[in-house]
Every structure is written in C-alpha cells, then in structure tokens.
Amino acid sequence: MENRWQVMIVWQVDRMRIRTWHSLVKHHMYVSKKARGWFYRPHYASRHPRVSSEVHIPLGDATLVVTTYWGLHTGEKDWQLGHGVSIEWRQRRYRTQVEPDLADHLIHLHYFDCFSDSAIRKAILGQIVSPRCEYQAGHNQVGSLQYLALKVLVTSKRSRPPLPSVTELAEDRWNKPQKTRGHRENPTMNGH
C-alpha cells in the first residue's frame, strides 16, 4: 500500500504569538464571555503528536478550527522553531482552508458588535450611533467610505485585553520592511 500525502497550508509563527493567542482566547471564553460557544482543546486532548492546541469557533452551522502546531521542521530563520498555525473551515463533511484575513472577517460577522446598517442614516440625522465596532481586525484592508466616516464619528473604546485576531497570529513580522520614524533622509548622504 502506498503512502498518501495530504498537503495543508501551515503559517509559520513565533512561539510567543501562539502563547498570546491562547491567553486571549481563554480570557474571552472564560472572563469577558465575548467568545461564547468557542471550544479550546489543549495538546493532551489531541491524538496528533504535533498539534499543540485547537480552537473550535462555531459560525452558524459551520465551524472555524484554528490549529496550532509544534515540532515542525524549522524554517529559514532560527526563531522559526517549528511552530505553525492552520485555519480550517468545516461544514458537515466539507473542509477547506482559509486565510487569516477571511477568518477574522467571519469571526467578526458572527461574534462581535459592529455598526448596524442604519448607523449611516442615524449619523446623517444627528442621532446617536450605537453600537461601535468592537473587532477592528475583522475589517480587512481600508473599508468602505461609510465605515471610515462612522469610525471617525464614533470614538472607539479600546478593549483590554484585545480580541483574538487570527491575522495577527499568522502575521509575518520578521520579513516586513522596517519603518524608520522621523528620518526623512540620511544626513550624511544629502550632499552637504
């Protein structure tokens, strides 16, 4: 019998990102109660030796499963000590993998308050707009002009601790170009 391989997308992440993700998920499941219905499975409850945890997030009749791994092959850099995360959408027998931005958007649609459809009309009429958007990570890219106007109109209240973002968990912060603050040009290279 031949070996059969199954390929999945696993985002390489830093071990500290995974620890932060676990603590945020547990806080919002057990303390703030904003993540009602979420299910956390620790490493010892999994039969797979490389799975360090699973978070099952119900989305209607589907489920989003965020699985973190350890003991994978190391990456190109020393800090990539074989830790990774995969994000899977499950509905009955159908399964597919999703990107972190889409996962955040789906979580936002099902769990956290955002501006209602009538908020734009209320803002134009000068009425009080509520609720405010709690989960900023669910709005990927720039957002619509109406959303940006509402965001300016209604001051957002920062939640402590922040809500768990799958995009931030899978973000590659080492390969991004660094931003330099306050230096418009190099003073030694401007010809003077």
UniProtKB/Swiss-Prot annotation:
Compartments where located: Host cytoplasm; Host cell membrane; Virion
Annotated stretches, region: Disordered: 163-192
Sites annotated Cleavage in virion (by viral protease): L150, K151
Residue window of motif BC-box-like motif: 144-153
Residues found modified as Phosphoserine: S144, S165
GO function term, MF aspect, one: metal ion binding
Annotated stretches, region: Multimerization: 151-164
Membrane association: annotated span: 171-172
Remaining remarks: Vif-defective viruses show catastrophic failure in reverse transcription due to APOBEC-induced mutations that initiate a DNA base repair pathway and compromise the structural integrity of the ssDNA. In the absence of Vif, the virion is morphologically abnormal. HIV-1 lineages are divided in three main groups, M (for Major), O (for Outlier), and N (for New, or Non-M, Non-O). The vast majority of strains found worldwide belong to the group M. Group O seems to be endemic to and largely confined to Cameroon and neighboring countries in West Central Africa, where these viruses represent a small minority of HIV-1 strains. The group N is represented by a limited number of isolates from Cameroonian persons. The group M is further subdivided in 9 clades or subtypes (A to D, F to H, J and K).
Protein name: Virion infectivity factor
Source organism of this protein record: Human immunodeficiency virus type 1 group M subtype G (isolate SE6165)
Gene: vif
